[in-house]
Amino acid sequence: MVDQFRSFSRTVTERVGALSDRFMERNRPLAQSRMLWEIGLEGCEIRLLRSRLGLDSGHASRLLRSLEAEGLAVVEPSASDRRVRVARLTSRGRRERALLDERSDTHASTILEALDPARREQLVGAMRTVERLLTAAAVEIRMVDPAGRDAVLCLSAYYAELNRRSDKGFDPTAGISAEPHELRPPAGAFFVAYLRGEAIGCGGVKHHDGAPAEIKRMWVAESARGLGVGRRMLACLEGCARDNGAATAHIETNGTLVEAISLYLSAGYVEVPAFNDEPFADHWFEKQFADVEAHKLNTTRTLPRHKSPSRWA
């Protein structure tokens, strides 16, 4: 499996011209051209450029300086917050970006035209699948402060979607509480999913001694749906609940959120009678965890360095 992955990577880097110092016959390598493209016509914060391209600050700075030296880009403070640096294309940079787009389209067409129509469709379909799966693998889930910037952005988008999709209207202060202090350790935890540095989903869990854990505020941005983020987030929240001794998890949801209902059922939840008086909920779900103690042992045990896992058998 690893050998195939590496072979695929070598083929792609060779075919797209990533090894050349003159990408698309211009006087710069792919990395600089990609930075030029990523800045975009509207400009972009340096922080986001680094996250999207997976670059450390030193490498990103070198690429930007090379574009500045060519007169293709400028770096300046943001108009809204002078502490934030923004990269913008110059007029020359915009023309160069348009030329790179044109040559990239021609290069792609040349590769596709070498195949018959059936193989062309097969290749493009496989590319679509690879892109989706590699994007899914790039998603990171991190525990964050539920009152932090990214958490608040996700929760605001979540509340807006609930109000848009349901005729009940959602008021987070009217139902079962999930306040920041309830979603911080040791009372609970809150997680945000990130893709290329941008928050695309969230979820929280409330711990209760001797009672089921409550999974709250699960949401995934529309742009990230289909990547398996919801399932990963749910597994993360369940793992957190089990690590804190829960034998059962509870989730309630609104009837309009059919995707959430489908996810919960496929993840082993069963619908049960209402276990709380959440006014926005139409469905209540429960999941029993098996082998909670074994799970806690496995997650706290650390294998000695350089020793095979079989030594624990």
What are the functions of these language-model segments?
Residues 47-48, 212, 234, 240-254:
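Conserved GNAT acetyl-CoA-binding A-motif
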Residues 220, 226-239, 262-266:
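Conserved acetyl-CoA-binding loop-helix of GNAT-fold acetyltransferases
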Residues 102-146, 285-287, 301:
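Terminal interaction helix/tail motif
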Residues 18-59, 64, 70-72, 180-188, ...:
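N-terminal helix-turn-helix DNA-binding core of bacterial DNA-binding proteins
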